[in-house]
């Protein structure tokens, strides 16, 4: 289970990971650690786009930095009253075991129409900072993403921020009621009028929509 705030850097605005961290420091956060990652993601769907329509995500990740490949299915659990995105991750225990996406989806018993095939690629460079304040931790990712359907030379580029509640890192144990921290952070950001805008779109939805509306 994953709960995170997502923001797009507004078009024609320059807003860096460093600037956002400065903003957090001014508001009492301390840096715990920071590192960089690179990953190439592939998004799959059937020809009816059933997964896209549900707001779910079926992705294959090639973690360049960690040299790891695997599939993951994310079910949309968003509450329209809340500013953050909630997703239930399926297949985490099977990651790395399957070479074929259709075998993976069959194992999870997900409702799709026929075979899945590739609908979108996203190559990203991610700057990660883990920050802390009053015992609450945030996993802040600043992503530079290129979306494309076949060839990277015909891609769309975007920058975005993801802020994940990191109270229990790398676990599926979530205190469902404890979302005060993320709500507080979102209020902080809204009041500061930073050049970023809240979004609930997955990267799959975002990339597919942006590429097809050019």
Identify the function of each model-found stretch.
Residues 1-214:
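Phosphate-end processing signature that detects enzymes handling 5′-triphosphorylated RNA
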